[in-house]
Amino acid sequence: MLNQVEKIIDGKVLYDSKRDAFYLKKGSSKQEFNLVSEGIRKMALIWQLVKNGMLEKGAILFWDEPEANINPMYIPIIVDLLLALSRNGVQIFVSTHDYFFSKYVEARKTETDDVLYHSFQKENEQLTIETSKEFALLEKNGILEAARRLYREEIEKLENYQ
């Protein structure tokens, strides 16, 4: 698992107890965390949590938009990491508005993975929650609706060029 995250962060996390600071070590250089991009810093923190044994069976991980500020090419690695953690007994709650992240979860989960999709809607000061084992089966699915809207615009644009 850590090897996959190291591909994203392109290094390892170090902690300097004298300065009470984290660093990202790349080769012979090290950068303070506050100088590292948000996406890389986020992945480095996950790396550190896994390495320190904080994300083991019985742990709970809440992660708001893991795909934010991350190269889209790394989304499959993040999904694989989250599914592996879940299979090892970590309960994971993820919020996302990203079509690709959602579809990668759907594509890579197995029948034995316990993945649920939730859609939260607020209408007239009333919160409604919809839950499904399949992403595409959520009736109120803003992510899919946005993807469909984009698809229709692309088709319309292609038709206008002909």
Label every model-predicted segment:
Residues 1-58, 123-162:
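Phosphate-coordinating catalytic segments in nucleotide- and nucleic-acid-processing enzymes
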Residues 27, 34, 69, 92-93:
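Short N-terminal micro-motifs specific to bacterial/archaeal maturation
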Residues 41-44, 76, 80:
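Short, contiguous clusters of charged residues that form electrostatic/catalytic patches at enzyme active sites
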Residues 60-62:
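Walker B motif beta-strand of ABC-family P-loop ATPases
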Residues 64-66:
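Walker B catalytic acidic pair
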Residues 77-162:
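C-terminal lobe/lid and adjacent interdomain/linker elements of RecA-like ASCE P-loop ATPase modules
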